[in-house]
Swiss-Prot record:
Taxonomic classification: Bacteria, Pseudomonadati, Pseudomonadota, Gammaproteobacteria, Enterobacterales
Family: Belongs to the SprT family.
GO molecular function: zinc ion binding
Name under which the protein is recorded: Protein SprT
InterPro entries xref list: SprT-like_domain, SprT_Zn_ribbon, Uncharacterised_SprT
Length: 165
């Protein structure tokens, strides 16, 4: 994977969004939750992750650089919501009703579980598989699970088992 140096302007925009949404949440919840640690160490196809125990948000620098505006608007509040839900409710379903409420009612952001960013630049080796209706690209991890007989994957559209090409 290529590594990227993030321009300071993008890092500042991320911090502005994080602080803005945290202040909004603290005001609406009547709390004073601290600012989480922020790092740009997320890799692979995940845009970001929230680490509850260390109260940290890890963002993918490549996807951030390639999709700055949408990333800052969507991913930063998404991960912050996970931390706020954990602080406010304790351990609950990652994208459950509490998270959805936090996103929509408290942070004022549409509650989307996944991003729609182009992943070609962050995708490592993939392996072609097919079904009746289309070709699929499986990650190295999923491909190895198939090879070892540990997993079977099916198409979400036609339901047929995926077969290596």
């Amino acid at each position: 994977m290529k590594t990227s140096r993030l321009p300071i302007a993008i890092q500042q925009a991320v911090m502005r969004r994080l602080r803005e949404k945290l202040a909004q949440a603290n005001l609406k919840l009547g709390r004073n939750y601290p600012e989480p640690k922020l790092s740009y160490t997320q890799r692979g196809t995940s845009a970001g992750t929230a680490w509850l125990e260390s109260y940290e948000i890890r963002l993918n620098p490549v996807l951030l650089l390639e999709n700055s505006e949408a990333f800052i608007e969507e991913v930063v509040p998404h991960e912050l919501a996970h931390l706020l839900v954990w602080k406010h409710f304790g351990r609950v379903a990652p994208h459950g009703k509490e998270w959805k409420w936090m996103m929509e009612s408290v942070l004022g952001v549409p509650a989307r579980r996944t991003h729609q960013f182009e992943l070609q630049s962050v995708r490592r080796n993939t392996f072609p598989y097919s079904c009746k209706c289309q070709e699929h690209q499986l990650t190295v991890r999923r491909h190895n699970r198939v090879v070892r007989g540990e997993a079977v994957y099916r198409c979400v559209h036609c339901g047929e088992q995926l077969v290596a090409k």
